[in-house]
Amino acid sequence: MRTFVRIVEAGSLSAAARQLATTQATVSRRLQSLETMLGVRLILRTTHTTRLTDDGERCYQHARRVIDSWLALEDEVGQTEDEPVGVLRVRAPHAFGQDQLLKPVTEFLQRYPQLSIEWMLNDRSADFLGDNLDCAIRVGVEVDPATVSVLLAEVPRSVVASPALLARFPAVTTPEDLQQFPWIAISSFYQRHVELFHDASPATARIAITPRLSTDSLYVARNTALTGLGVAVVSSWTVQDDIQEGRLVHLLPEWQPAALPVHLVYPWSRYYPARLRRFLELMRQVMPEVTGMRKPVQQP
């Protein structure tokens, strides 16, 4: 049954075999045994795809509940102190996942010796079933109603440009002046316009921009801004030293882009294992203190 569930959630027999550390032939035999025992075809297979039959869909829903219940029993009976065990599969953004979050994650693993973590860096939205993920740390607004999103922190942002670029244009004194510049867009967060908020009044400004370069990488945006290619909106922590040392200029500091929310996201379930619950507790505790983040501003 667990093999069948893993096939469904991994998306193919070969992917399930890799995750289970076994051969595709073994996975296929287990699936055939389950289908023979139930007397129905659960998965339709072609050379390139697999898909659930109607019976397979019903079987998967029941099997998922049975496995969740069994895991809950294991936690309750086998771990009297609710200590996390097993493997936690986490997706984190490149910018934070390769640096600032490593220390708390390492300490977390040292605290729980029976736990392992698969720490995968990717800035795309999480496909929990296809990638077999337990949770994901996401920067930006989450709108998937099938998931639980826990707000952990927020990331302040700044508008920056190089002195060489600024020397080619009239001085910037209002948000509208930014429209004259070439731009570097971070496609995950802004592409054709930038919205700014005044820090001492309710005033807002929506600026149309013309990107010379669009990227999904925060580091690419920062590095190309340093070359003078264009103006960019970036996470403030990535350019703090550049601003202090004069490599970049913080434009209109009284006008700020909205800070980006940081969530821990995971699929809704009737049961959450101790490893996920403890990791959520850790992230709630450490995330607002991570370099470049702050506690979320309470909304009115």
Where are the model-predicted features located?
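Short helix-boundary/capping micro-motifs
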Residues: 6-21
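Central regulatory/effector-binding core of bacterial HTH transcription factors
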Residues: 85-148, 296-300
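A short LG(V/I)-centered, amphipathic sequence patch enriched
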Residues: 35-52, 248
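The DNA-contacting recognition helix of HTH DNA-binding domains
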Residues: 24-25, 98
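A bilobed periplasmic-binding-protein/Venus flytrap-type ligand-binding module shared by bacterial periplasmic
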Residues: 262-272
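Short helix-loop hinge/linker segments at domain boundaries
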Residues: 47-50, 54-57, 68-91, 297
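C-terminal regulatory
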Residues: 127-130, 142-262, 289-300
